[in-house]
């Protein structure tokens, strides 16, 4: 059986055959997983996730694009593109100890209206769709907060 690493902490996920979600035995997060039907695809996912965790979002997105080109119905690859587009890294919340998303790239565009996110929802099953929506709502709240803060900042000039 394939070993899939947690998107949040890097621990091994508890996999159940045929399931589209898994629970991390270390941090307890429930998350979506790719279809486990192809070893080549799983290796590509592993490499893309490693790059994304290192905040190499453009390189990771390139690998996710390759996966999407080869496997058009793979919701997890589209989700990887979304995470890269918004520069999502999961960090420890000092208050709760849980992993929460942080955005390294801000955008005026809503994650809920993103074309790749629409592909995620279209290609995901019911269980995975619920997890994707919950994570997207969390990311959307962060994005809105960033936009609100930037709207209240004084304009400034930069001289080089």
Model feature map: region roles:
Residues 144-160:
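Conserved N-terminal substructure of TIR/SEFIR domains
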Residues 3, 21:
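Residues immediately within or flanking Cys/His clusters that coordinate Zn2+
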Residues 37, 87-142:
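Short coil/linker segments at helix-helix boundaries
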Residues 62-96:
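Short, charge-rich amphipathic alpha-helical segments embedded
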């Amino acid at each position: 059986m394939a070993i899939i690493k947690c998107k949040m902490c890097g621990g091994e996920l508890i996999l159940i055959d045929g399931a589209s979600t898994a629970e991390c035995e270390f941090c307890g997060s429930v998350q979506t997983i790719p279809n486990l039907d192809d070893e080549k695809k799983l290796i590509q996912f592993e490499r893309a996730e490693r790059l994304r965790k290192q905040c190499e979002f453009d390189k990771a997105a390139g690998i996710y694009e390759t996966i999407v080109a080869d496997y058009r119905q793979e919701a997890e690859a589209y989700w990887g593109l979304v995470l890269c587009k918004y520069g999502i890294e999961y960090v420890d919340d000092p208050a709760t100890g849980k992993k929460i998303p942080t955005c390294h790239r801000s955008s005026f565009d809503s994650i809920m209206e993103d074309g790749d996110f629409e592909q995620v929802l279209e290609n995901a099953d019911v269980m995975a769709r619920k997890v994707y929506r919950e994570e997207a709502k969390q990311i959307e709240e962060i994005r809105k907060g960033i936009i609100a803060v930037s709207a209240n900042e004084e304009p400034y000039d930069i001289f080089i």
